[in-house]
């Protein structure tokens, strides 16, 4: 319930994504002026950047209802038909998270719904089977995905608007922390909020989570104001360093450096050495390490950079293998 209370309701309250918000204001005003539903919108970007929150904001700005579901939850066309025919009114928004995980059968039934607001359902089997056409309310579909490359071309072509969410700056993340603190009645200094923002991996969801944990530490210690010093102590207790690396992130780099001489080493070999699932390593940990310049993916395998050596306090080797 606390997260719902903190969720922004308008584009002005939504922090960050300024270029996207500027375009959305145009799209929303145009739709309202024409008294038409918003064009179908696809939002893509890494997890935790606020795609679901943005869908709620758009619905609130338009004054329409929002129906939230996910790709894996729509297993067959009947599931989709039930949502479209029974849960939506004219102008409402259907939000499908992880839309890249829609089944092929459900996706094919979504095409005419998006284009013509109709859906054909087959009733019965064999010679007695018959097709019923459902007339649907004119709705707007907002799809969200962290894997845009898995969106099929036919589905992608049916979105009138395709937008990318970017990582947040530490300053934007600090603004988010300050906003949550204000709404929760928690006193925190701007310096403390910025330290949280710097360790939040460019992700608002992480910033909100870290703020709640820092608040826990301050509350238990009886602190009335979360200062920079208190925030740093709490963040250190959580195992985060100044780049926001967690214990597991540092272990990945240490194994690369100490066991494999910085690499290159294959994903499967590295995962085995860490007793980690290769998918978790590749999708959860590596993107941030790569973005921070601590790790590289090469045709021969993973390589720790000179920056990784310096961050962990190891003297970098001399040679052409590692690049800063």
Curated annotation (Swiss-Prot):
<feature type="region of interest" description="Small ATPAse domain (RuvB-S)">
    <location>
        <begin position="169"/>
        <end position="239"/>
    </location>
</feature>
<feature type="binding site">
    <location>
        <begin position="115"/>
        <end position="117"/>
    </location>
    <ligand>
        <name>ATP</name>
    </ligand>
</feature>
<feature type="binding site">
    <location>
        <position position="158"/>
    </location>
    <ligand>
        <name>ATP</name>
    </ligand>
</feature>
<feature type="binding site">
    <location>
        <position position="7"/>
    </location>
    <ligand>
        <name>ATP</name>
    </ligand>
</feature>
<dbReference type="GO" id="GO:0016887">
    <property type="term" value="F:ATP hydrolysis activity"/>
</dbReference>
<dbReference type="InterPro" id="IPR008824">
    <property type="entry name" value="RuvB-like_N"/>
</dbReference>
<feature type="binding site">
    <location>
        <position position="52"/>
    </location>
    <ligand>
        <name>Mg(2+)</name>
    </ligand>
</feature>
<keyword id="KW-0963">Cytoplasm</keyword>
<comment type="similarity">
    <text>Belongs to the RuvB family.</text>
</comment>
<keyword id="KW-0233">DNA recombination</keyword>
<feature type="binding site">
    <location>
        <position position="48"/>
    </location>
    <ligand>
        <name>ATP</name>
    </ligand>
</feature>
<dbReference type="GO" id="GO:0005737">
    <property type="term" value="C:cytoplasm"/>
</dbReference>
<feature type="binding site">
    <location>
        <position position="205"/>
    </location>
    <ligand>
        <name>ATP</name>
    </ligand>
</feature>
<keyword id="KW-0547">Nucleotide-binding</keyword>
<protein>
    <recommendedName>
        <fullName>Holliday junction branch migration complex subunit RuvB</fullName>
        <ecNumber>3.6.4.-</ecNumber>
    </recommendedName>
</protein>
<feature type="binding site">
    <location>
        <position position="297"/>
    </location>
    <ligand>
        <name>DNA</name>
    </ligand>
</feature>
<dbReference type="InterPro" id="IPR008823">
    <property type="entry name" value="RuvB_C"/>
</dbReference>
<dbReference type="GO" id="GO:0005524">
    <property type="term" value="F:ATP binding"/>
</dbReference>
<dbReference type="InterPro" id="IPR027417">
    <property type="entry name" value="P-loop_NTPase"/>
</dbReference>
<feature type="region of interest" description="Head domain (RuvB-H)">
    <location>
        <begin position="242"/>
        <end position="324"/>
    </location>
</feature>
<feature type="binding site">
    <location>
        <position position="52"/>
    </location>
    <ligand>
        <name>ATP</name>
    </ligand>
</feature>
<dbReference type="InterPro" id="IPR036390">
    <property type="entry name" value="WH_DNA-bd_sf"/>
</dbReference>
<comment type="function">
    <text>The RuvA-RuvB-RuvC complex processes Holliday junction (HJ) DNA during genetic recombination and DNA repair, while the RuvA-RuvB complex plays an important role in the rescue of blocked DNA replication forks via replication fork reversal (RFR). RuvA specifically binds to HJ cruciform DNA, conferring on it an open structure. The RuvB hexamer acts as an ATP-dependent pump, pulling dsDNA into and through the RuvAB complex. RuvB forms 2 homohexamers on either side of HJ DNA bound by 1 or 2 RuvA tetramers; 4 subunits per hexamer contact DNA at a time.</text>
</comment>
<dbReference type="InterPro" id="IPR003593">
    <property type="entry name" value="AAA+_ATPase"/>
</dbReference>
<feature type="binding site">
    <location>
        <position position="168"/>
    </location>
    <ligand>
        <name>ATP</name>
    </ligand>
</feature>
<dbReference type="GO" id="GO:0000400">
    <property type="term" value="F:four-way junction DNA binding"/>
</dbReference>
<comment type="function">
    <text>Has Mg(2+)-, DNA-dependent ATPase activity; dsDNA and supercoiled DNA but not ssDNA stimulate activity. Binds to linear dsDNA in the absence of ATP or ATP-gamma-S. This subunit can promote Holliday junction migration alone in vitro. Partially complements an E.coli deletion for UV sensitivity.</text>
</comment>
<keyword id="KW-0238">DNA-binding</keyword>
<dbReference type="Pfam" id="PF05496">
    <property type="entry name" value="RuvB_N"/>
</dbReference>
<dbReference type="InterPro" id="IPR041445">
    <property type="entry name" value="AAA_lid_4"/>
</dbReference>
<dbReference type="InterPro" id="IPR004605">
    <property type="entry name" value="DNA_helicase_Holl-junc_RuvB"/>
</dbReference>
<dbReference type="Pfam" id="PF17864">
    <property type="entry name" value="AAA_lid_4"/>
</dbReference>
<feature type="binding site">
    <location>
        <position position="6"/>
    </location>
    <ligand>
        <name>ATP</name>
    </ligand>
</feature>
<dbReference type="GO" id="GO:0006281">
    <property type="term" value="P:DNA repair"/>
</dbReference>
<keyword id="KW-0378">Hydrolase</keyword>
<dbReference type="InterPro" id="IPR036388">
    <property type="entry name" value="WH-like_DNA-bd_sf"/>
</dbReference>
<keyword id="KW-0227">DNA damage</keyword>
<keyword id="KW-0067">ATP-binding</keyword>
<feature type="binding site">
    <location>
        <position position="302"/>
    </location>
    <ligand>
        <name>DNA</name>
    </ligand>
</feature>
<feature type="binding site">
    <location>
        <position position="51"/>
    </location>
    <ligand>
        <name>ATP</name>
    </ligand>
</feature>
<feature type="binding site">
    <location>
        <position position="53"/>
    </location>
    <ligand>
        <name>ATP</name>
    </ligand>
</feature>
<comment type="subunit">
    <text>Homohexamer. Forms an RuvA(8)-RuvB(12)-Holliday junction (HJ) complex. HJ DNA is sandwiched between 2 RuvA tetramers; dsDNA enters through RuvA and exits via RuvB. An RuvB hexamer assembles on each DNA strand where it exits the tetramer. Each RuvB hexamer is contacted by two RuvA subunits (via domain III) on 2 adjacent RuvB subunits; this complex drives branch migration. In the full resolvosome a probable DNA-RuvA(4)-RuvB(12)-RuvC(2) complex forms which resolves the HJ.</text>
</comment>
């Amino acid at each position: 319930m606390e997260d719902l209370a903190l969720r922004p309701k308008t584009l002005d309250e939504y922090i960050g994504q300024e270029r996207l918000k500027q375009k959305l204001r145009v799209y929303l005003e145009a739709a309202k002026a024409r008294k038409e539903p918003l064009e179908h919108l696809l939002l893509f970007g890494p997890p935790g950047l606020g795609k679901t929150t943005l869908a709620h904001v758009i619905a609130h700005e338009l004054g329409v209802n929002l129906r939230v579901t996910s790709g894996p939850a729509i297993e067959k066309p009947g599931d989709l038909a039930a949502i479209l025919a029974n849960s939506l009114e004219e102008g409402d928004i259907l939000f499908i998270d992880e839309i890249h995980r829609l089944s092929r059968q459900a996706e094919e039934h979504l095409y005419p719904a998006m284009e013509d607001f109709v859906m054909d359902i087959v009733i019965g089997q064999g010679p007695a089977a018959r097709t019923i056409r459902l007339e649907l309310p004119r709705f707007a579909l907002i799809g969200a995905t962290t894997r845009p490359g898995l969106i099929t071309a036919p589905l992608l072509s049916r979105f009138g608007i395709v937008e990318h969410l970017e990582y947040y700056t530490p300053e934007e993340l600090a603004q988010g922390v300050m906003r949550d603190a204000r709404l929760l009645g928690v006193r925190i200094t701007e310096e403390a909020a910025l330290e949280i923002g710097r360790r939040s991996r460019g992700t608002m969801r992480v910033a909100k989570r870290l703020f709640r944990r820092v608040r826990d530490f301050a509350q238990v210690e009886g602190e009335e104001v979360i200062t920079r010093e208190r925030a740093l102590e709490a963040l250190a207790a959580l195992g985060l360093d100044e780049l926001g690396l967690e214990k597991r992130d540092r272990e990945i780099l240490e194994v690369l450096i100490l066991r494999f001489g910085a690499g290159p080493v294959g994903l499967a070999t590295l995962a085995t050495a860490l007793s980690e699932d290769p998918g978790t390593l590749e999708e959860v940990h590596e993107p941030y390490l790569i973005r921070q310049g601590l790790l590289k993916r090469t045709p021969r395998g993973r390589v720790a950079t000179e920056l990784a050596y310096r961050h962990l306090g190891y003297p970098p080797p001399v040679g052409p293998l590692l690049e800063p």
